[in-house]
């Protein structure tokens, strides 16, 4: 990172970042290949999109691309001819793909350098456990007990490419880079019938860069307004976010809501917790039904008026946690109200006190999981196990290892469930599916195969889970039944494991 820092240093009196010359440097294409793509997708990279490519020719491909960019007239080819005009064995689409990834890497480095410089001289607390997906659930368990409503919003996608380009203008001031990026984006996406919601982009890094830029602009504005309009002169956000005519846009937004003065009034309440996940976001607060409806229409008008993005009111759901369930990261979350009667006695008088105990309840969505298992041919739609015929060509040990891995991953992730009954049902489906698969491979019945194999097969499914729990809890506590009734949140789950992928 230090060797590339000099390329991003600029004269702060002019406040300009000239990124366009970096597209003609071969070293940055190497950085995009080594640093970027291998981390996101190790089994696939941009240089391997062409079947005839060999690694030793990577430098030659980059040099040809740079030479072709110098010859601008030869780079511009109609979209319909993109795939019919190969250049030295590679299509123009292949080169547009390389440029798009390079643009994402360059801008990411620029933002990271600014972010590091903004924290110089400050002490930052490092907590690697907060990276875990399960770390959100203890937070919600602690905070949602004091709130009664949750606004569940599906973040809309921009319907036009120019909206994405305009979003980048707030952070990238180099006009040449933006024009070049706009040209490549339109040419590439027109050929591929671009749809950001369907993720038809071949480069995961480029897609994440566009999506995060879009969401970052939305979040920065929302969090900015949440601190009330009296903070408009705050300069704390200038380090990370650079906008064009930022104050003017805020004034325009206020004019849009001139007929809704009460909508902006609810922003005075600082007790709003915000969480974003899987293209959705939730806001937890303690409000009245009237204020929650105002909050809903605020989101709709914010997206339509400021971001020029159509947001249907049906995509903004208001959930009352005591009555409704919230689908959150694979769990069905809600607040369970348990009545509690306490007998109190003062001197000679005794009386009963009715109290309500609020508990954060997390359940396993058994219907959706069975649907996923049915789609992958582990069971039918009713949840009855079937044999996995596509795995019968593998060895017995490999088949058992695949099923045990899937069962272990599910047990590991859904260990935070309040009720383990549904988890045991999923384990039963996988165990019996494994037995049926092995019996089908050996052309035997399930009963005869289990009689010949014994109980050793079923013990393998319990060994993996037992080893994990025994490393955390003492043996006496692990052996007790109380452990299986309590929820366990693991802080080492950084991503969702593919249940079927065995590579």
Curated annotation (Swiss-Prot):
Keywords: Chloroplast, mRNA processing, Plastid, RNA-binding, tRNA processing. One of its GO terms (molecular function) is RNA binding. InterPro entries: Domain_X (IPR024937), Maturase_MatK (IPR002866), Maturase_MatK_N (IPR024942). Its main location: plastid. GO terms for biological process: mRNA processing; RNA splicing; tRNA processing. It is found in: Plastid, Chloroplast. GO terms for cellular component: chloroplast. Usually encoded in the trnK tRNA gene intron. Probably assists in splicing its own and other chloroplast group II introns. Belongs to the intron maturase 2 family. MatK subfamily. This is Maturase K. The gene is matK.
